[in-house]
Amino acid sequence: MKKILAFVLIMAASLPQAISAKKNEVPSELKVMSYNIRLATGKDGTNSWEFRCPATIEMLKDQKPDVFGVQEALINQILFMKEYCEDYDNVGVGRDDGKKKGEFMSIFWNKKTVKMIKWGTFWLSETPEKPSMGWDAHCKRTATWALMKDKKTGKKFYFVNTHLDHRGKEARKNGLKLIVDRIESINPEGYPMVLTGDFNMKPDNPAFVGLDARMKSARKVAPKTDNHNTFNAWSVKPSDKVIDYIYFSGFSSCLEYQTVTKKYLDRPFVSDHYPIIARLIF
């Protein structure tokens, strides 16, 4: 009886200290980005990759995301960013063969602030474990996921990056559903989750219903946000083309959502999509 009483007294004495430590815990911020880089093609004239690649590096060094997902990147673009952004590493595969062929839905992270634990890629199709085209898609589409750890707090989180089909309506709907189902199955621990990507559909599309029920749109919930279009088509003219997104779950809040429209190295655009950023709090 005396031992039990002593244990209770010790626990009671330590409780205020635990509560005080929790109150004094400094919130940790995770800055994430989604960036459709526009694949390297000669069809873009003066907006081709060879002309805007230095501006991309300048943008990344200026914005300093902890983690970012790129869409449409070819292997030469991946290697260029790794060479000139020394603080970053990446994972991902080419969508055409699961190796280096085709566009990458790659995830980059700052090695100083984030640690990679494990990662994988699946295809948005009826056979997601192998390179394949799903439903009415025009191209092979993938999602890359990674389990990561914030070095400051030691907290783990998942980051998922994708690019839905630009033509197939069923492919977009079913692809997004597959992503939602998959990210739930790989995260039984319920770690915080980030989903980035070019979804090729506007916010009012019915295909968002399932995702909206499980995750929050940074654009919609951040107290500091904007209403800028994310697809620019190499034009500064405003439009309603909001097709790039950052969704999250498990974080305490989203401080800010931002569409990056700033010019770098006098280049009017770093892509035909504007990068988008969210500042999340654990």
Where are these regions (language model features)?
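N-terminal, active-site-proximal structural segment of metallo-dependent hydrolase catalytic domains
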Residues: 2, 15, 19-84, 97-102, ...
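Sec-dependent N-terminal signal peptides
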Residues: 4-13
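Active-site beta-strand/loop signature of hydrolases that rely on acidic residues for catalysis
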Residues: 30-37, 56-81, 108, 146, ...
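Structured beta-strand-rich core segments of catalytic domains in phosphoester-bond hydrolases
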Residues: 67-158, 253, 258-260
